[in-house]
From Swiss-Prot:
InterPro entries the record matches: bL21-like, bL21-like_sf, Ribosomal_bL21, Ribosomal_bL21_CS
Entry annotated with the keyword Transcription: no
Family: Belongs to the bacterial ribosomal protein bL21 family.
Signal peptide stretch: none
Protein's UniProt keywords contain rRNA-binding: yes
Protein name per its UniProtKB record: Large ribosomal subunit protein bL21
One Gene Ontology term, aspect cellular component: ribonucleoprotein complex
Lineage: Bacteria, Pseudomonadati, Campylobacterota, Epsilonproteobacteria, Campylobacterales
GO molecular function, one term: structural constituent of ribosome
Keyword list, A-Z: Ribonucleoprotein, Ribosomal protein, RNA-binding, rRNA-binding
Swiss-Prot/TrEMBL GO biological process terms: translation
Subunit structure: Part of the 50S ribosomal subunit. Contacts protein L20.
Domain of life: Bacteria
Length: 104
């Protein structure tokens, strides 16, 4: 089984063909094709090729499914005996993509 490890938005993802991955928001329309070129490693037929830092000529082709927002994450800080508290929420914007092809 072939897989690839790529970098997008400061994070690294390990994928195989057909996987659905949540990436940082990319402002692409649904059904649009995306090429991910920052491929760190590719394994095909048991042979692993690692890049320094990226694998030459390797890319991952993906299709945009949709965009969305994640669940709200709440951070709450309270300082005891001081009548001081802070509540802040955060929702991640993401683009859901399907990995269609790994080219190495």
């Amino acid at each position: 089984m072939s897989y690839a490890i790529f970098k997008h938005g400061g994070k690294q993802y390990k994928v195989v063909e057909g996987d659905i991955v949540l990436l940082d928001k990319m402002d692409k329309e649904p059904k649009a094709l995306v090429e991910l070129v920052e491929v760190l490693a590719v394994s095909k037929e048991g042979k692993l090729s690692c890049g320094k830092p990226f694998v030459n000529g390797a890319k991952i082709e993906a299709e945009v499914i949709n965009e969305g927002r994640g669940k709200k994450v709440i951070t709450f800080k309270k300082r005891r005996r001081k009548d001081s508290k802070t509540k802040r929420g955060f929702r991640r914007d993401f683009t859901r993509v399907r990995i269609t092809k790994i080219v190495a």
